[in-house]
Amino acid sequence: MAKTVYVLNGPNLNTLGKREPGIYGGKTLADIEADCRAAAAGLGLEVEFRQSNHEGMLIDWIHEAGERGAGIVLNPGAYGHTSIALHDAIRAVSPLPVIEVHLSNIHAREPFRHRTMTAPVVAGMICGLGPIGYTLALQALAARL
């Protein structure tokens, strides 16, 4: 049976393809989901792909992944920069590996985006590589499992 990786997406990622394509690219979240499913299949993994604009829902899904999943790819969106609650949820499911993904290079953007509250508790972070960052995160998780 294939191991399941949760791919969790935070606020405003449902607007990909329309929202600031110069920063986030032209792919939609559905396109990224298809890429993730194809990459996961090639790695012998299954994907549980979800998106929410609500912090509490993301926390519930992190807890669920802690019970049922083999790892998490997390694009917390702006919550990554502000949410102690996401930090605590990730810490609560340790040692489950979590890879944080950001489509844009957060270090080349506004100063308030340079640091994430979640970075200290994730296994690694991929940022600035666009949608391929999700595939790279799945590869990194597969190597750890």
Swiss-Prot record:
Its EC number is 4.2.1.10. This is 3-dehydroquinate dehydratase. The record marks R19 as: Transition state stabilizer. Pathway: Metabolic intermediate biosynthesis; chorismate biosynthesis; chorismate from D-erythrose 4-phosphate and phosphoenolpyruvate: step 3/7. Transmembrane segments: none annotated. It comes from Chelativorans sp. (strain BNC1). The gene is aroQ. Catalyzes a trans-dehydration via an enolate intermediate. PANTHER family: CATABOLIC 3-DEHYDROQUINASE. Belongs to the type-II 3-dehydroquinase family. Homododecamer. Substrate binds at N75, H81, D88, L103, S104, R113. It comes from the Bacteria. It is an enzyme of class 4 (lyase). The active site is at Y24 (proton acceptor), H102 (proton donor). Keywords: Amino-acid biosynthesis, Aromatic amino acid biosynthesis, Lyase. One of its GO terms (biological process) is amino acid biosynthetic process. InterPro entries: DHquinase_II, DHquinase_II_CS, DHquinase_II_sf. GO terms for molecular function: 3-dehydroquinate dehydratase activity. It catalyses: 3-dehydroquinate = 3-dehydroshikimate + H2O.
